Regions:
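Hydrophobic membrane-insertion alpha-helices, especially the h-region
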Residues: 43-58
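Active-site-adjacent mobile loop/cap segments within catalytic or ligand-binding domains
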Residues: 343-401
């Protein structure tokens, strides 16, 4: 029977493939018919001719094309093998030119809306485990748009609580970032000052009696969200350090402890520029109900995020380069809202430092609240990473040739 094998490979790979197939078929054909042997011999003659054609053609790795070779076998199966065959740009081919619409986009790295398998298992596990929970209080879903906004330009909304700093968002967006990223070296550091911050495991409009929103289980707390961000950035081609150190054994010492962690990584990798302290918020109404910042993006519920950036004034000292962080925050807020409208709560610009004085691209980001589910927060983590990767793409160092 005729078997069609689609090959995408260079000549060396193709040669190895034919050699492997030859040995395999030699064994199989010991018990074969004379007709089968003739067909096999004929198929390898064709393959040898194709290899010679590739070599004589001077093919170079410039334009990828598909090549089909015909193999005659007796099992009647059809297979497709994905490797690579290339031709020189001087060759005439019928392959259509690659258009912009055909080029892969970052969002095609994976289905950004797909719930990771480990989280699906956690949802299943805790749905059973919490089946007999008693209600301790309500959860209110809120979509934040303009509450508390003091400054707005296009899709960037900011809540400015500083006493002396004014904002010109339009001007800030017109200013490029002093960012230069080398993809071969660590460019991003992710850590968690409040490492034990956790989430709801199942979606419901109430929280359980005696429920605690903290856990050191990194499969269920803010570390899992950091992992989602780091993984997506790495799949986008960036080198990321995700530090999972528990910094909040003593809650009051969290920021001093995380500062040591950041200092260690900056000393070991001075090329790190973007430093993200990933948290989740906690908001409670006067009646005890917890607030869940939420929006629906691409038909899937997502935890709303809030970027926090600070300024040197009043009680905040030794923060001379705060404007660099502010610029980065505004650009990232704009990118997130452009790519995923409704993902962001208004950015908080305040009289705070939170270790953001350590680099020019340091931010604290609140990934939903304790009333959000882990699934909602991780979904938002992937969208944040996608937007950050898109922003970083604009500042990648060109490789020296």
């Amino acid at each position: 029977m005729l078997q069609i094998v689609t090959i995408k490979s260079d000549a060396h790979t193709y040669t190895l493939y034919i050699e492997k197939m030859y040995h395999k078929r030699s064994i199989e054909m010991k018990n074969g018919t004379q007709k089968d042997k003739h067909l096999d011999f004929f198929s390898y003659l064709i393959s040898a001719a194709l290899i010679i054609a590739i070599c004589l053609g001077g093919y170079a790795e410039k334009i990828s094309v598909a090549m089909a070779s015909f193999m005659f076998h007796s099992d009647g199966t059809t297979k497709e093998i994905s490797t690579t065959v290339t031709v020189s740009d001087t060759q005439t081919t019928t392959v259509p030119p690659v258009t912009e619409s055909m080029k892969p986009h970052k969002s095609e790295i994976c289905d950004i809306t797909e719930t990771p398998s480990d989280i699906k298992e956690l949802i299943k596990k805790y749905t059973k485990l919490f089946a007999d929970d008693k209600k301790g209080g309500g959860i209110q879903s809120v979509t934040y748009k303009k509450v508390g906004v003091t400054d707005e330009y296009k899709n960037v909304r900011v809540k400015n609580t500083t006493e002396t700093k004014s904002l010109n968002i339009k001007k800030i967006l017109s200013e490029p970032l002093e960012l230069s990223v080398d993809k071969s070296k660590p460019a991003v550091l992710i850590f968690h000052s409040h490492t034990s911050e956790g989430y709801e495991m199942t979606e419901r409009d109430w929280f359980a009696e005696g429920y605690t929103a903290r856990t050191n289980d990194e499969n269920r707390n803010i570390v899992r969200v950091g992992t989602e961000i780091a993984d997506y950035l790495e799949k986008s081609g960036y080198t990321v350090i995700h530090d999972k150190t528990i910094h909040d054994k003593s809650y009051s010492d969290s920021y001093s402890e995380s500062r040591k962690t950041v200092a260690k990584h900056l000393e070991e990798h001075p090329e790190i520029q973007i430093v993200l302290d990933i948290h989740r918020d906690s908001m409670t109404q006067n009646n005890g109900d917890k607030i869940k910042p939420i929006n629906t993006i691409a038909d899937k519920k997502a935890a709303q995020l809030m970027i926090i950036t600070g300024a040197e004034e009043g009680k905040v000292k030794d923060f001379p380069d705060w404007e660099d962080n502010l610029r980065f925050a505004v650009h990232l807020q704009n990118k997130c809202e452009t790519m995923y409208p409704g993902l962001m709560r208004p950015m908080l610009f305040s009289q705070r430092k939170y270790n953001m004085d350590m680099t020019h691209f340091s931010l604290l980001i609140e990934m939903g609240s304790e009333a959000n589910t882990l699934e909602e927060a991780c979904y938002s983590g992937r969208m944040l990473a996608s937007a950050l990767a898109s922003l970083m793409d604009e500042y990648v160092k060109e490789e020296k040739k």
